[in-house]
């Protein structure tokens, strides 16, 4: 078993003089040997501050150069990083720290945040601050000491906690996902196998996805270093700058959610020739719209692949050639999955041509151990040796599946099951729509009424126009919304995901006449 630190240490043993990390803010760049030396000094400084094996240390930071160094230093000590989304409110960050038994924290320099976090920690807990430019008033820069004082690597067991990542929190406060030491190398092995990354690929990677996201940490940062590549930090995502960095640095590999790729191709300085150095582009974490996928495939260098996973599983399914079948997925290397009846058990497998819930063998070494201090939720999601993803899939004869959407979002109207992912892309294809979400609200006649929540673009749109558009598209009549609401923007959480619970409340209030937002029934 190789830990996160050991994977990078081995890379340094193989190629000590290769460039490992390059910062976009300062002039710092480390070879692999220099990176390990820096990590050892930071680890020694942390040890002097009481951090050691098993210490839970929260980080709430962008994808900074020093954030990456910090995570490796914590792993050198056998400490457990708890990676929080830095875009969460100070109150949410403090609540998660208190709930998770966190013992120390490293944060952006913000007095209000520090005060809230300090109140959630023990009186003598370590709190360090970090910034992109290492400005005065930040304390992480002083966290260095003599690496010679460090002892040998701690002896860690397979089931010892390695990391705590957090879900996106679309239904409440994010849940802490505990990942054991065994998962680290297996997540890297799975990704490299399914993505087609042979050992020694020497990737040149643009790192703009936050390390608190499984894609950003495993899929971008760690896989790059494990493969002796170079990780170019973009400490704050900017699509204009990203275009320039891809071209100027000769970036060969990117992995991100589709929304960030859309921002790149929509930037005013975008040109296909800027992307010619790319050899491999992976996407995951959200559904991609076919026009964007087709554009990336046609205009960017290399190949585009879809990697499906969750924070809990990282990777389970993939599609090596998603163009033309963007929802199609197949089980990956040593993945065991089933599609079962909704509310069914592991043996209630659906027939080919039917939809059901995707479950993943929890015995896989990529799968999480538990939700932090949430035994009831753990028992609900880990049952009979399987992880219940909550994702709805259509099973094909050959074992492939089509990813339909979340079971939590399923609308049950008039005895039919309707998933928002069947309706939303058709709405967004209208020239007068820039964003849309489809929900179901309680209704005496239908059980649930389908309601479209729409953000209109400059061209404008009306409920009647959109209904006519859906009729012309061939969408089944029972799937068409029975009411429309128009918003300036849809509510989203810190991870950028639509807060459907907020839309439910807004729609029910508008329907009942308790809102200024118009509820336009069709």
Task: For the regions a language model picked out, list residue spans one by one.
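Conserved adenylate-forming
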Residues: 46-51, 55, 149-159, 164-207, ...
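AMP-binding/adenylate-forming catalytic domain of the ANL superfamily
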Residues: 475-497, 516-522
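Structural core segment of the AMP-binding/adenylate-forming
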Residues: 7, 48-49, 72, 76-143, ...
């Amino acid at each position: 078993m190789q830990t996160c630190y050991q994977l990078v240490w081995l890379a340094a043993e193989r190629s000590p003089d290769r460039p490992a990390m390059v910062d976009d803010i300062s002039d710092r760049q480390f070879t692999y040997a220099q990176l390990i030396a820096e990590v050892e000094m930071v680890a020694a400084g942390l040890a002097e501050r009481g951090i050691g094996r098993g210490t839970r240390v929260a980080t709430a930071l962008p994808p900074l150069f020093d954030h990456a160094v910090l995570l490796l230093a914590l792993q050198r000590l056998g400490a457990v990083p708890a990676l929080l989304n830095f875009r969460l409110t100070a109150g949410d960050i403090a609540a998660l720290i208190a709930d998770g038994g966190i013992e120390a924290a490293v944060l952006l320099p913000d007095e209000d945040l520090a005060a809230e976090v300090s109140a959630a920690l023990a009186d003598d807990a370590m709190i360090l601050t970090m910034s992109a430019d290492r400005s005065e008033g930040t304390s992480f820069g002083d966290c260095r000491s003599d690496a010679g004082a460090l002892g040998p690597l701690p002896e860690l067991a397979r089931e010892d906690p390695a990391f705590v990542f957090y879900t996106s929190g679309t239904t409440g406060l994010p849940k802490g996902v505990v990942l054991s030491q065994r998962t680290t190398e297996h997540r890297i092995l799975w990704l490299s196998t399914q993505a087609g990354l042979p050992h020694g690929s020497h990737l040149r990677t643009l790192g703009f996805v936050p390390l608190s996201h499984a894609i950003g940490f495993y899929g971008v940062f760690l896989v790059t270093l494990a493969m002796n590549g170079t990780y170019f930090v973009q400490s704050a995502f900017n699509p204009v700058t990203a275009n320039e960095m891809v071209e100027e640095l000769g970036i060969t590999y990117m992995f991100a959610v589709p929304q960030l790729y859309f921002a790149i191709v929509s930037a005013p300085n975008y040109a296909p020739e800027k992307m010619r150095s790319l050899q491999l582009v992976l996407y995951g974490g959200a559904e991609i719209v076919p026009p964007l996928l087709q554009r990336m495939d046609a205009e960017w260098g290399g190949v585009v692949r879809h990697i499906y996973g969750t924070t809990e599983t990282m990777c389970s399914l993939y599609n090596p050639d998603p163009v033309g079948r963007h929802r199609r997925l197949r089980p990956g290397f040593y993945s065991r999955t089933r599609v079962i009846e909704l509310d069914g058990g592991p043996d209630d497998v659906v027939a080919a041509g039917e939809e059901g819930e995707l479950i993943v063998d929890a015995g896989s070494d990529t799968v999480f151990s538990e939700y932090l201090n949430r035994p009831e939720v753990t028992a609900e999601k880990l049952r009979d040796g399987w992880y219940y993803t909550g994702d709805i899939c259509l099973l094909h004869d050959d074992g492939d599946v089509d990813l339909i959407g979340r079971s939590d979002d399923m609308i049950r109207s008039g005895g039919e099951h309707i998933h928002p992912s069947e309706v939303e892309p058709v709405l967004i294809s209208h020239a007068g729509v820039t964003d849309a979400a489809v929900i179901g609200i309680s209704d005496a006649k239908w059980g649930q009424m389908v309601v479209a929540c729409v953000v209109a673009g400059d061209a404008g749109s009306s409920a009647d126009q959109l209904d006519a558009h859906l009729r012309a598209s061939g969408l089944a009549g029972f799937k068409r919304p029975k009411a429309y609401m128009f918003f300036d923007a849809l509510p989203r959480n810190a991870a950028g995901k639509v807060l459907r619970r907020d839309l439910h409340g807004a729609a029910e209030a508008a329907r009942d006449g308790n809102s200024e937002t118009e509820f336009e029934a069709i």
